[in-house]
A protein has these predicted regions:
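Cofactor-binding beta-sheet edge motifs in enzyme active sites
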Residues: 2-26, 35-716
Length: 716
């Protein structure tokens, strides 16, 4: 999930296009995604693809093509800010529209790993700066002046001494004939006037008044609806079905078997096709299906936990090792050992899964909410055996993605049914489908050990992760990848350290979930660091600072959160505070959770967070993302879980899969660290630290350790 800080194998464009009086700028992607010398269109070698990212027309209209979907993370506001800053225009002058799904032109368009801002920050600045310099050069040529004698402001080029002015619209025809600068001068952060300022999201209004289009809203002429009955036991196979009563339901057109692929496993179902979703659902309820579930009904949460504990005895794959842990642990004066458990979790997106697909002859069209436009396009082309250029993907706003919408399985179902029916088909999952079918966040067992020497110093730490591997669900590899250990701070200055993982293979489907493995591992590691601090008779925050002397950014957020939370002040009666830290998507966060005893239960009073995400494009967006992810972290910490009994998910809807309620939401204070480091991802960083900070706060208040989630605030 974690993308590189720079866009791989991509050259910054130096291309301009002329289409009437239009200046277009973008990047070039070379054939095979190889780095090469960037050519202008007239001299471009075969395989060079030109893609306009911005267009400025003769009316001065500036259009930015956003090649990554908006799913609530705020890119529709932040991305134009980056361009406007370097282009020397006000934010209001930049219109943003979705770019078509086209890997050849736009590279990866997948929205994962909090990658949108950090992946586009420098390229968009370069595009804006290049356009600005070209427009200034065009004006200078017109006035027979040096470019240095001119400057740009609010979409106008001005001559410094004469005061002559020319709007961008007047200059685009001349500017489009110029060669773009190879290294346009970028503003220094101290000179930013747009980046770093708070501005309201431009999609707020349409989302509030109902104008914004989500996948589930899409309608096209001649469309039909589909509701699919799937086995409650994962990997169950359809033996037979009786659709007699289903076909008697008014509006039902057809009943068909279908399937989808989930991380290499085929999931079968029976689809009811109807003229309305209501009719499809009613027809589905009347279906009689015989399933072959094999021996899969033996699985339960209890068995899974037992298997995990047995697996913990294995050494596993070693991902990182410093010093000699075994020797240091054996010779430690104080030994600390603890295990931590986290359950499966559903994404439970506000907008249930859905997809609209129309297949005809050698052509396919998709409409829907997706984090992965390229993946949908590739999937449908492969599935239908048609050229990828014959697949058109229309991606909409998303009612939440959280990793679930990076998958293409729902589109696969819709395409299969559309091909069979010869009509556009919209597949809609019910809330029960969404919660019971997954894929889920992986459950995990974390086994931790630490040694404290005779001087009270932490001399050794070992952390072993036991869980499924998202990328290895078909049994192809015997060992888990190191990514399953994400979220474990390896920067603590402990001389003897070992990080390892043991792969567990189950048929229960898992996938990316907000913050992925950070959401489980951080709970274990930061809870354990707290236990180690208490065993060493040291303050938990102070111990972290002492172990992070050489880590500037983690030290900064810890010091800031200690100040903002009044960490070292005496606690009020019947309250407790806990602290935790994490690095996620390049951002660093320290969090303090404060709890209080209210009658017989515990209440979360306040969350205080300090965030270092590098250069802050829009502080409102960063704060909102931190608040939202913190609340989702609270839900996972003490409200929700997916449990398995007899091979089936026990939770069905929000009556059993509990979500945090508005009245349960605590005060949240977020402080942003001013920085000139490159901007990093913030969509997930606020989630992992909530559970450990909460558990540590409960320990300070009650003296009871929480080592299994979800915890109960009523039974502490």
């Amino acid at each position: 999930m974690k993308p590189p800080k720079t866009i791989p194998r991509r050259e910054f464009l130096k291309m301009s296009i002329v289409s009437g009086a239009v200046l277009g700028l973008g990047f070039t992607y070379l054939e095979g995604d190889k780095i090469g010398i960037v050519k202008l269109p007239a001299t471009g070698s075969p395989g060079t693809v030109l893609n306009p990212y911005i267009l400025i027309d003769s009316d001065g209209k500036i259009t930015l093509f956003n090649h990554r979907p908006e799913m609530g993370q705020g890119t529709f506001q932040s991305i134009p800010m980056i361009l406007a800053e370097e282009l020397a225009v006000t934010l209001e002058k930049v219109s943003i529209v979705p770019a078509p799904a086209d890997r050849e032109k736009y590279g990866s368009q997948m929205v994962v790993g909090s990658s949108s801002i950090r992946g586009q920050f420098v390229p968009l600045r370069k595009i804006g700066a290049a356009a600005r310099e070209m427009l200034i050069q065009a004006a200078a040529n017109r006035w027979n002046a040096e470019p240095s004698a001119c400057y740009a402001e609010d979409a106008v080029v001005i001559h410094r001494t004469s005061g002559q002015k020319a709007s961008y619209g007047e200059l685009v025809a001349d500017a489009s004939k110029l060669t773009p600068p190879e290294n346009p001068a970028l503003k220094k952060p101290k000179d930013f006037t747009i980046i770093g300022t708070a501005s309201p999201r431009r999609d707020n209004g349409p989302k509030v008044n109902g104008q914004a289009m989500f996948g589930i809203d899409i309608q096209v002429p001649g469309m039909l609806y589909a509701s699919v009955e799937r086995s409650a036991v994962f990997l169950g196979k359809v033996v037979s079905y009786n659709a007699e009563k289903t076909k008697a339901v008014p509006g039902v057109i057809e009943v068909l078997k279908t399937q989808r692929n989930v991380w290499g496993h085929t999931r079968e179902g029976v689809a009811v096709i109807a003229t309305s979703y209501w009719a499809a659902e009613q027809g589905r309820k009347a279906l009689k299906i015989t399933w072959d579930n094999g021996d899969l009904e033996q699985f339960s949460s209890g068995k899974i936990k037992a298997d995990y504990k047995n697996a913990a005895a294995a050494d596993g794959a070693v991902f990182k090792e410093d010093g000699n842990f075994s020797n240091a642990f054996d010779n430690a004066t104080i030994k600390v050992e603890a295990s931590y458990e986290t359950p499966y979790q559903s994404h439970a997106c506000m907008e249930p899964m859905n997809a609209m697909v129309s297949v005809s002859d050698n052509h396919c069209e998709f409409w829907g909410s997706t984090q992965n436009p390229n993946g949908v396009r590739s999937q449908l082309a492969s599935q239908l055996d048609i050229p990828e250029e014959n697949v058109i993907v229309h991606y909409t706003f998303m009612g939440g993605g959280l990793g679930r919408r990076s998958m293409t399985d729902v589109a696969e179902e819709a395409a299969d049914l559309s091909k069979k029916m010869g009509k556009p088909i919209k597949v809609i999952w019910s809330r029960e489908d969404d919660i019971t079918q997954g894929p889920f966040r992986a459950c995990s067992l974390n086994v931790c050990q630490a040694g404290i020497d005779s001087k009270g110093n932490v001399s050794a730490i070992a952390h072993k992760v036991i869980c499924q591997d998202i990328r290895n669900q078909t049994g192809d590899n015997a060992e888990a990848g190191s990514h399953i250990a994400g979220g474990i701070i390896t920067d603590y200055a402990v001389p003897n350290f070992r990080l390892s993982g043991v792969l567990q293979k189950f048929y229960i489907p898992i996938t990316y979930w907000r913050a992925v493995y950070h959401s489980t591992n951080c709970f274990a590691h930061e809870s354990f660091i707290d236990e180690v601090a208490r065993a060493a008779k040291k303050d938990p925050l102070s111990l972290r600072l002492s172990l992070l002397k050489n880590h500037r950014r983690l030290t900064n957020v810890l010091k800031m959160v200690s100040e903002k939370s009044a960490w070292y002040a005496p606690r009020e009666k019947n309250t407790g505070k806990g602290v935790a830290i994490v690095e996620r998507s390049g951002s660093f966060i320290a969090m303090v959770v404060e709890v209080a005893r209210v009658k017989e239960s515990i209440k979360v009073i306040k969350i205080t967070a300090a965030v270092d995400c590098g250069i802050i494009v829009n502080p409102d967006i960063v704060i909102a993302q931190t608040e939202g992810s913190a609340l989702m972290g609270l839900t996972a910490a003490y409200k929700s879980q997916i449990s398995i009994e007899a091979g089936k998910v026990s939770e069905k809807n929000f009556d059993t899969y509990k979500m945090l309620m508005l009245h349960e939401s605590p005060e949240i204070e977020v402080t942003l660290i001013k920085s000139e480091d490159p901007p990093e991802g913030v969509g997930e960083a606020g989630l992992p630290t909530v559970a450990p900070a909460l558990a540590n706060a409960i320990f300070e208040l009650t003296g009871k350790r929480i080592r299994s989630l979800p915890l109960s605030l009523d039974k502490v």
